[in-house]
């Protein structure tokens, strides 16, 4: 694990949502690393692209792009080679392969996915919802959410919320801390929409120690203390039992696996 922050530029001649979703799915696999992701949408000219690439060079950023314009795509790829930058061309290979197999010439028109996909605006709304109601910022969100996630610190509440939001679900989450008052709204939510996240004490201890080290702090703190962690988990488990909600141990599960369990649970109740 590195203490440094990895800069990532997501560049697109459309809104950049495809690239952002892809890089988010990748970065959540590295919970002990720090990433600074910036999106540069509607980049449709070489002159505009040059300024962004020069900034990426100064910051030694990873570049992920989803250009459908071959000229812009080639420009970024060549810039990366010339300046020893890591460039991820997320779309060209897909389009070229489909063109070869179908024998059809691609339109090379930006944003067609969003124009043709009726779920696009639903997902954008869900992503905005997840950001607004992350970390228990506004308890009213629990009553509006499709899914409510509960969990102690470092149980992947936020990345899981964003992943589910990208599937179109409105998600609100609440961090659980012993001796703090649980918002009354939680008790008003249908238990079938609440999911209690937990983790193994040893896993939490390791994650929290590494987090302290990444900040240049002493890893042996109250935050990473095993007795404290066990108290937190006991507090969470008792609450889950009181609410009658589904409990999910995320210790050995990826974000995608946990999300699948949640979605399957929701679908089984419909």
UniProtKB/Swiss-Prot annotation:
The keyword Lyase does not apply. InterPro entries: Kinase-pyrophosphorylase, PPDK_reg. ADP binds at residues 151-158. Its EC number is 2.7.11.32, 2.7.4.27. Pfam families: Kinase-PPPase. The keyword Ribosomal protein does not apply. Keywords: Kinase, Nucleotide-binding, Serine/threonine-protein kinase, Transferase. It catalyses: N(tele)-phospho-L-histidyl/L-threonyl-[pyruvate, phosphate dikinase] + ADP = N(tele)-phospho-L-histidyl/O-phospho-L-threonyl-[pyruvate, phosphate dikinase] + AMP + H(+); N(tele)-phospho-L-histidyl/O-phospho-L-threonyl-[pyruvate, phosphate dikinase] + phosphate + H(+) = N(tele)-phospho-L-histidyl/L-threonyl-[pyruvate, phosphate dikinase] + diphosphate. One of its GO terms (molecular function) is ADP binding. Bifunctional serine/threonine kinase and phosphorylase involved in the regulation of the pyruvate, phosphate dikinase (PPDK) by catalyzing its phosphorylation/dephosphorylation. Belongs to the pyruvate, phosphate/water dikinase regulatory protein family. PDRP subfamily. This is Putative pyruvate, phosphate dikinase regulatory protein.
